[in-house]
A protein has these predicted regions:
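N-terminal alpha/beta PP-like core and its mobile active-site loop of ThDP/TPP-dependent enzymes
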Residues: 1-131
Length: 131
């Protein structure tokens, strides 16, 4: 079992039914693991829309709304919906992609410290490095 499969199992155990978001190179392992899950991926055209859908799902159901994005600019598009969810007390989880800097031929291209950016707008922000 790889890290993505373990993460999907944890989401299933928490009762997650839907994930709103956009596929990208940096979250393909996660999406592959999602293929065998009962959790449904709701594709969106923009990360901000995915964030608002997840926040509103949380508001209406009381269950955690989960949204998914790629790295860098895709992840920063969650900022407004993160603030909206926090101010409204809506349960929401944001999952963003990231790539290892060492393996990237492009260096820091599109790599943003999303954890530090989201801390003021969320209850908890963490990057998973090792499983």
């Amino acid at each position: 079992m790889n890290a993505s499969e373990l993460f999907i199992k944890a989401l299933e155990n928490e009762g997650v039914e839907y994930i709103f978001g956009i596929p990208g190179e940096e979250n393909l392992d996660f999406l592959d693991a999602l293929r065998t899950s009962h959790i449904k991926l709701i594709l969106t055209r923009h990360e901000q829309g995915a964030g608002f859908m997840a926040a509103t799902y949380g508001r209406l159901t009381g269950k955690v709304g989960v949204c998914l994005s790629t790295l860098g600019p895709g992840a920063t598009n969650f900022a407004t919906s993160a603030a909206y969810a926090q101010l409204g007390g809506m349960p929401m989880m944001m999952i963003t992609g990231q790539k290892p800097i060492k393996k990237s031929k492009q260096g820091r291209f599109q790599i943003i410290d999303i954890v530090r950016m989201m801390r003021p707008m969320t209850k908890f922000a963490k990057q998973i490095v090792n499983v």
